[in-house]
Amino acid sequence: MSKKLLIKTWGCQMNEYDSSKMADLLNAANGYELTEEPEEADVLLLNTCSIREKAQEKVFHQLGRWKTLKDKKPGVVIGVGGCVATQEGDHIRERAPFVDVIFGPQTLHRLPEMIKQSQSEDAPVMDISFPEIEKFDSLPEPRAEGATAFVSIMEGCSKYCTYCVVPYTRGEEVSRPMDDVLYEIAQLAEQGVREVNLLGQNVNAYRGPTHDGEICSFAELLRLVASIDGIDRIRFTTSHPLEFTDDIIAVYEDTPELVSFLHLPVQSGSDRILTMMKRPHTGIEYKSIIRKLRKARPDIQISSDFIVGFPGESDKDFQDTMKLIKDVDFDMSFSFIFSPRPGTPAADYPCDLSEETKKERLYELQQQINAQAMRYSRLMLGTEQRVLVEGPSKKNLMELRARTENNRVVNFEGSADLIGQFVDVKITDVFANSLRGEIVRTEKDMDLRSVISPTQMMAKTRREDELGVATFTP
């Protein structure tokens, strides 16, 4: 009987990516198969996020539930990973001594070894160090699960915004070697992946070493990924205004695989608040980037992150944010009330704003962006949109669900053999959270670009033989 593994994931897309790699690692090393039933699991892993308020209490609440299972089934292994594990490792050991394994985002590759050690020594094991690129060197071959895939190209953050814990929990910025990234994406393309989402805390800060000792910029990487046959759509998240340079903007002019949608966090429209946040840009500088982007790609739509109620935020500061939202005409946002993160400078800033005022500001901001998003959706009515078919519709299994470049779900009638392919649809109806369409043409009638096959890309990419000697085919 196979061993069972349950992974509970909280947080960002990077955590989702990490959890998928944990599952692959434990399957390859020990034959663990995923389950959604805690009672079935031999290993219970919690991949945590420390961005939101009360993250630690949420972790201990979940661990309390799992302790009940461990009391009934003493052999079950409980592990805590992610950013809360890095921040609170010693506290977890003290408050939840029944936890067997504690690991950080940069040490998840050691999971099979750590689980085995905890079982053989009957003692907790903890590793929350930052071994830089070692994590990526130790991950298993990628496995495609559908037509879209996430690929982590860099880790960490070196910006140290005053409100953010990421530099303390994921370490400084470290970029994966260019060849490793391209090799992974080519493997995924061979397995049928059509869209890749490049991940990093500051993904456009990517500076990946190449086989010949040079450095590959993010703009260069985008063009190389776009050249792989089968990869016909590229997204990336999360980017930072500081590194959103003109060479990246130029890629939008000549690379159709790069979607006309960008998530570029600004956090506030007030220069005073941006300075307090230690954000290295002003509102005008942010708008300048957007103007250049829209010149290069007129139909591009922008989403952002916003923090309301930051310590010291005045009515004028908030109105500056609202003005920026209207000026840029954002299509979407992730917006939150400020919550102090332990260990960050902003946690010690005095704040005299009432909770009621913070909630009112958040509501006003979200209502404005929702109105802008609905206007964008209505503008799509009657237009043709190229969509990637993801699977059956969640509301009607007899229909298909697809996604537009600007991240909207479209439901339409079609046969199951279209799943994993691109189709052009005409938008016939607009709803609050989705669109409806009808097929205009299928992929066989499209002129999708072909440059280099996945097999050729893998052959060109640096590998090492069994002795660890690097090889490269130019």
Swiss-Prot record:
Residue stretches making up the Radical SAM core domain: 143-375
Cofactor: how bound: Binds 2 [4Fe-4S] clusters. One cluster is coordinated with 3 cysteines and an exchangeable S-adenosyl-L-methionine.
Domain of life: Bacteria
Natural source organism: Vibrio vulnificus (strain CMCP6)
GO molecular function, one term: 4 iron, 4 sulfur cluster binding
Identification of the protein by name: tRNA-2-methylthio-N(6)-dimethylallyladenosine synthase
Function noted in UniProt: Catalyzes the methylthiolation of N6-(dimethylallyl)adenosine (i(6)A), leading to the formation of 2-methylthio-N6-(dimethylallyl)adenosine (ms(2)i(6)A) at position 37 in tRNAs that read codons beginning with uridine.
Keywords: 4Fe-4S, Cytoplasm, Iron, Iron-sulfur, Metal-binding, S-adenosyl-L-methionine, Transferase, tRNA processing
Cross-referenced InterPro entries: Elp3/MiaA/NifB-like_rSAM, Methylthiotransferase, Methylthiotransferase_CS, Methylthiotransferase_N, Methylthiotransferase_N_sf, MiaB_methiolase, rSAM, rSAM_horseshoe
